Amino acid sequence: MDNFDNVLVIDTDGHVYEGNVDLSSRMPEKWRSQAPIRLKDNEGNSRILLEGRIWSASQGPGPGVSGPMTEKARGYRPGMVDPVARLKDMDLEGIDMAILFGTQIALTVNGLMSGELATVLCRAVNEWLLEYCSADPKRLLGVGLIPCQAPQAAVKELEFLAKAGAVTAMLPTNVYGLKNMGDRMFDPIYDCAQSLGMPLSVHPQTGHDGVPGVSGVMGAGSERFFKYVYVHMTAFPFELMIAMMHMIGEGVFDRYPKLRVGFMEGGAGWLPFWAERFDEHIEKLAPQMPDLKRRPSEIIKSEQVTLTCESEETGLDRVFAANSENTVMYASDYCHWDCHFPYSVKDIIDGRDLSFAQKEKLLNKTAIDFFQLKNLPQANALKIARQSWENGNAQKAANA
């Protein structure tokens, strides 16, 4: 049996929960009256009030996280706001480094009508997240938040994030007004990211503000569903497929050949199908995409594109064979309801689809290259986690 104890494990999509943080003190005084207000809906779900609207809607078309769940659904953990607790949970799971996305504000801010408010909130969240990561800067790495509906402000925030040490910045799958990510309005963002050498990470979302067709954070097809289960199943992979398609088709990767973009939390199994389907459409409909200079599959197989897998996902061997062994990265999704804490790393290690070398690429090598990570910690978490798996401490944490 292969020994993974000395393998560095990098989680490329973990989450904090900035919705539980009072951001008002981090906002300029004139904006503090518009700071997010935390509240509970009738089911006890956490929601925020922004721009006079509740995010996300709990009922109606395209609801956010809501409805009954089984005991296997994971709950909120203190590590999402407390970095010391987070580091302990990382040891339980076998994670040496975690790349951290926001949740409630991060997945909302690009749906706001006011680009100015979005800009202020991005800075407030970024400053809090950087402070969170300072608890152990080798192990906790921040994903910056930028106001994409205000591209020039987003450029300034990217420059701030690069100097502050963020390893990537989050892109939504679309922004307020339902602008897709291949739109030329976002070129200043892509130009800046390429110049800085900073990769961008597209992260989908579910839920919206109750105004279908207006909010930029409603997933594809969500307005047709009144149950969260259908919204979640479709929004995450479909929105990534759309964002990737539009960015490729509108020539983003050709205009910016050194730009690197990750597509997070939508699984990986769909990638060979999507590349093949896109190539087929180009053979017959290329005149409709004059800015596309290469076959879509060529771009998807290049170092410009990567994505994350689900820890329990099967069939990754087919993705590696069809695309590249340097395309897919491990992600825990800690600690959202659908994550597999504290067993996501164990899922990868125990999986039968991939060789040891392929799993090592999945767990660290692809992430190191994509995010250009330096100053790596010593691999140690898996040794600790293995003990917790064997002595039952991991199960106790899962049941807590």
Q: Residue spans of the language-model regions?
A:
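Active-site-proximal gating segment of KS-fold condensing enzymes and close homologs
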Residues: 116-132
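Active-site flanking residues adjacent to catalytic metal/cofactor-binding acidic residues
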Residues: 10-12, 202, 264, 332
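Mid-to-C-terminal alpha-helical segments outside catalytic/metal-binding sites
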Residues: 2-10, 19-69, 73-97, 127-135, ...
